[in-house]
Design a protein with these regions (language model features):
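Double-stranded beta-helix
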Residues: 131-188
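N-terminal export signals
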Residues: 4-20
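Conserved metal-binding segment of the jelly-roll/cupin
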Residues: 114-133, 143
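Short, conserved beta-strand element in jelly-roll/cupin
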Residues: 87-101
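A short, N-terminal "cap"/entry segment at the start of jelly-roll beta-barrel domains
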Residues: 16-84, 178, 183-188
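Short alpha-helix capping/helix-loop boundary micro-motifs
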Residues: 105-108
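His/acidic/aromatic-lined binding-pocket segments of jelly-roll/cupin-type domains
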Residues: 90-94, 112, 119
Length: 188
């Protein structure tokens, strides 16, 4: 077991605090431009690969991690199999079981393969759609405090774009907390 996996397990189980957490490594960044009717966002999608060790009860571990970092979990399920976005909330998807192909950015967007232990942070307006998934695929969805998600399946009107602009920047990264990558990467 490497140091990152060991320390990540310590953090995820609550044995270690956030200071010095190996989860603070740099996530992959996807910069998505408007695509057809999908508005997307100038803020990057953040993909944390293998950020949470895969252990029994991983969904509980993901929920505790997100809660600890100020992103209260709101559901466990999958990802819709239709293109959509949220205009009123940023969203974090913690992949708790299985594997899936997710298209980001709308039709003809970017397809990413996600596995249990990965995390994706989607800024408001980011198109996403499940292309395929294993039978055991499970996701924990969470949002910053006081953000209530909607589901948009059509082109953004001026009112929808204004709602997206008003969504606040989160105070912390759902994976690595206040000192994590998100507050540094999502600035304007």
């Amino acid at each position: 077991m490497d140091r990152r996996t060991f320390a990540a397990g310590m953090v995820a189980t609550g044995i270690a605090g956030r200071a010095g957490s190996p989860l603070a490594y740099a996530p992959e960044q996807l910069h998505l431009k408007p695509n057809g009717w999908m508005p997307n966002n100038s803020l990057p999608v953040l993909l944390y690969r293998k950020s949470i060790p895969v252990t029994p009860g991983l969904a509980d571990v993901v929920e505790r991690l997100f809660t600890q970092n100020g992103w209260p979990p709101q559901w466990r399920n999958g990802v819709f199999d239709f293109h959509h976005y949220h205009s009123t909330a940023h969203e974090v998807l913690g992949f708790a079981a299985g594997t899936a192909e997710i298209m980001l950015g709308g039709e003809q967007g970017t397809t990413v393969t996600v596995h249990a232990g990965d995390v994706a942070v989607l800024p408001a307006g980011t198109g996403h759609c499940r292309i395929s998934a294993s039978d055991d695929f499970l996701v924990v969805g969470a949002y910053p405090p006081n953000e209530h998600w909607d589901i948009c399946r059509s082109a953004a009107t001026p009112e929808v774009l204004e709602r997206m602009r008003r969504v606040h920047f989160p105070a912390s990264d759902p994976v690595s907390g206040k000192d994590g990558a998100l507050p540094k990467l999502w600035t304007s």
